[in-house]
Amino acid sequence: MGITTSKFVWMNGKFVKWQDAKVHVLTHALHYGSAIYEGVHAYKTDEGTALFRLNEHIDRFFYSANALSMSIKFAKSQLISSVKKLIKMNRIGDGYVRPLAYYGYGNVGVFPKDIPTDVALIAIPWGYYYTKDLRIRTSSFIRHSDKSSVYGAKLSGNYANSILAMHEVRKKGYDEALM
């Protein structure tokens, strides 16, 4: 599934054009998986766009940031109001919102000493994820133990084994991996 673009992205407190939302290749998160995110579904209703459990998603966003000792320089209320404004600016009905925070550009090394935490909000139009029946196969890769990371946090680095599992089952003609 390709990405449907929008007009604007919110980055570190500013609305920027989609094509200008970029990071440096030495961004810490690209090398070490030091990013956190959420996925919030948006639904077109008669009263406008409804955001599914936005408050709870932003609460978990801060929980996940704390797990990686990230300092989010924006208040919860500011992120929520920025999501709502971004939805309007991008004219999203049915869609998807991706709050993202990551250790940015600063040094090359696992420990993110003196590296800023960058925050972005992305809102794109998005309908149903699946539009047909799925073929699912159990993967030989297993889910990470809850004791191998911070339980309940959405840490991007935790998803590497899910990528491996998807490659494995797709090569065998299946749509999704069960872990």
Each predicted region: which residue ranges?
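Active-site microenvironments in enzyme catalytic cores
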Residues: 41-45, 89-91, 96, 100-102
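Helix-start/capping segments and mature chain N-termini
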Residues: 1-74, 81-85, 110-179
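Short, glycine/charge-rich beta-strand/loop segments that flank catalytic centers
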Residues: 75-84, 94-108
